[in-house]
Amino acid sequence: MKVYGLIGKPVSHSLSPVMHNALFRKYGIDAVYVTFEVEELGKAIDGVRALGISGLNVTMPYKEVVTKFLDELSEDAREINSVNTIINLEGSLIGYTTDGVGARKALERFTEIEGRNVLILGAGGAGKAIAYELSKIANIVVLNRTPSKAKSLEKFGVKGGSLDELPNYVGWADVLINATSVGMGTNESLVPRRLLRRELIVMDIVYKPLKTRLLRDAESVGCRVIDGLWMLIYQGAESFKLWTGIYPDVELMRRVSLERLGKG
């Protein structure tokens, strides 16, 4: 039996085991997906090699720091210095990022994204990956609490700035994406409701709660909203394909996730 898993801190909230284990069953793959709450990342990666764990997802707070423990990075992962998927290839650990593609596919499920103006809040591992991927097809502004981190993405043709500049850019945006953890398990939002307008498409990468404060506010003014579960599903589907060669059933992933959340 092959073992796959998720490393991060915290990980107990994750829906990844529910999704991937359902997929292993569907496709008759002798494998299991588990979570590992990790305190010491370097030792955990040594354990992956020693135990022969076949593959990993990586979540907060390790998406960037994990890169220095790996043997090889995909071009995208190297460009943004962020990894959320690892393949163990006969003891050689190769890092990939599927966050950007996951976000793009989630958006494209609901709207045309090419040539649109996209405002991304947050320049951490997920925010960077989303900005890098969408910069290939759309106009991107990234705002971050630490502006220098957002400005470091300007090499990809995006504009970076401070979250304090939010009121200046919401009117410009066709799509707004919260790529921070603000709203996870709290009733907080980075975006005051008064700045939202009904033409805006609003996406949140947070999926617990499924309807964050940001999405509730956006719905209340008539915006189209995309919950964080869609991005989780599509980035997870890309990870599954890297591990198995199979692009999986995303509708099954959504269904089992909603059942676990009690919203099936």
UniProtKB/Swiss-Prot annotation:
- Identify the catalytic residues: K63
The record's section on InterPro entries has: Aminoacid_DH-like_N_sf, NAD(P)-bd_dom_sf, SDH_C, Shikimate_DH, Shikimate_DH-bd_N, Shikimate_DH_fam, Shikm_DH/Glu-tRNA_Rdtase
Where shikimate binds, per the record, is at S14, L15, S16, T59, N84, D99, Y207
Any idea which UniProt keywords this protein has? Answer: Amino-acid biosynthesis, Aromatic amino acid biosynthesis, NADP, Oxidoreductase
Chain residues that bind NADP(+): E75, G122, A123, G124, G125, A126, N144, R145, T146, P147, S148, K149, I205, G228
Its biological purpose is as follows: Involved in the biosynthesis of the chorismate, which leads to the biosynthesis of aromatic amino acids. Catalyzes the reversible NADPH linked reduction of 3-dehydroshikimate (DHSA) to yield shikimate (SA).
Q: What is this protein called?
A: Shikimate dehydrogenase (NADP(+))
What taxonomic classification does the UniProt entry list for its organism?
Archaea, Methanobacteriati, Methanobacteriota, Thermococci, Thermococcales
